[in-house]
Amino acid sequence: MMYHIPGVLSPQDVARFREQLEQAEWVDGRVTTGAQGAQVKNNQQVDTRSTLYAALQNEVLNAVNQHALFFAAALPRTLSTPLFNRYQNNETYGFHVDGAVRSHPQNGWMRTDLSATLFLSDPQSYDGGELVVNDTFGQHRVKLPAGDLVLYPSSSLHCVTPVTRGVRVASFMWIQSMIRDDKKRAMLFELDTNIQSLKSRHGESEEILSLLNLYHNLLREWSEI
């Protein structure tokens, strides 16, 4: 399943990020991809050795960790270190699949269950640059407002179309979920969403308590901690 997570960063945060990223050191984006991806990748990324990068990636981690909808949809166990990319002048990233595992500075290795893109450019400021994701439900073309995030299975083939006008800037990361299976994770998210909706409409009740009990027992049964 694919999820749109709105308002991860406020407009003020986005403006501040963009101002700081204007001063960043950018390098060839192929430095963080494998042999297959390098053949179709043509973009730039912020140098991960820079002081600015360390500060910005911490802010992204804090923002996603504090977002209730992100947590409900991803049920994250481990988050990768966020990266930042930039596309301009017809730069693109052809269809590819993300690697199944990635190195992690604290955990050694992590499994990539979910991929996330946090948009940092206003969609009207550039042409092209759509994230295209192929999954079992078809093809999805994504171009979200700045500050919004899209979450999708890392097993999906995906690409970024050429940016023919303007500049597309984004942050991206990977998530190892407590729930490895996409279908089980989607069921838990649907159950959680409906429980919260019922609570907001009707308040607490024995029926809602029973559904909460079911949710946590399923999470207990399926989670890998």
UniProtKB/Swiss-Prot annotation:
<dbReference type="Pfam" id="PF18331">
    <property type="entry name" value="PKHD_C"/>
</dbReference>
<protein>
    <recommendedName>
        <fullName>PKHD-type hydroxylase YbiX</fullName>
        <ecNumber>1.14.11.-</ecNumber>
    </recommendedName>
</protein>
<feature type="domain" description="Fe2OG dioxygenase">
    <location>
        <begin position="78"/>
        <end position="177"/>
    </location>
</feature>
<feature type="binding site">
    <location>
        <position position="158"/>
    </location>
    <ligand>
        <name>Fe cation</name>
    </ligand>
</feature>
<keyword id="KW-0847">Vitamin C</keyword>
<dbReference type="InterPro" id="IPR041097">
    <property type="entry name" value="PKHD_C"/>
</dbReference>
<dbReference type="InterPro" id="IPR005123">
    <property type="entry name" value="Oxoglu/Fe-dep_dioxygenase_dom"/>
</dbReference>
<feature type="binding site">
    <location>
        <position position="168"/>
    </location>
    <ligand>
        <name>2-oxoglutarate</name>
    </ligand>
</feature>
<dbReference type="InterPro" id="IPR006620">
    <property type="entry name" value="Pro_4_hyd_alph"/>
</dbReference>
<dbReference type="GO" id="GO:0006974">
    <property type="term" value="P:DNA damage response"/>
</dbReference>
<dbReference type="GO" id="GO:0016706">
    <property type="term" value="F:2-oxoglutarate-dependent dioxygenase activity"/>
</dbReference>
<keyword id="KW-0223">Dioxygenase</keyword>
<feature type="binding site">
    <location>
        <position position="98"/>
    </location>
    <ligand>
        <name>Fe cation</name>
    </ligand>
</feature>
<dbReference type="Pfam" id="PF13640">
    <property type="entry name" value="2OG-FeII_Oxy_3"/>
</dbReference>
<dbReference type="InterPro" id="IPR044862">
    <property type="entry name" value="Pro_4_hyd_alph_FE2OG_OXY"/>
</dbReference>
<dbReference type="GO" id="GO:0031418">
    <property type="term" value="F:L-ascorbic acid binding"/>
</dbReference>
<keyword id="KW-0479">Metal-binding</keyword>
<dbReference type="GO" id="GO:0005506">
    <property type="term" value="F:iron ion binding"/>
</dbReference>
<dbReference type="GO" id="GO:0006879">
    <property type="term" value="P:intracellular iron ion homeostasis"/>
</dbReference>
<keyword id="KW-0408">Iron</keyword>
<dbReference type="InterPro" id="IPR023550">
    <property type="entry name" value="PKHD_hydroxylase"/>
</dbReference>
<keyword id="KW-0560">Oxidoreductase</keyword>
<feature type="binding site">
    <location>
        <position position="96"/>
    </location>
    <ligand>
        <name>Fe cation</name>
    </ligand>
</feature>
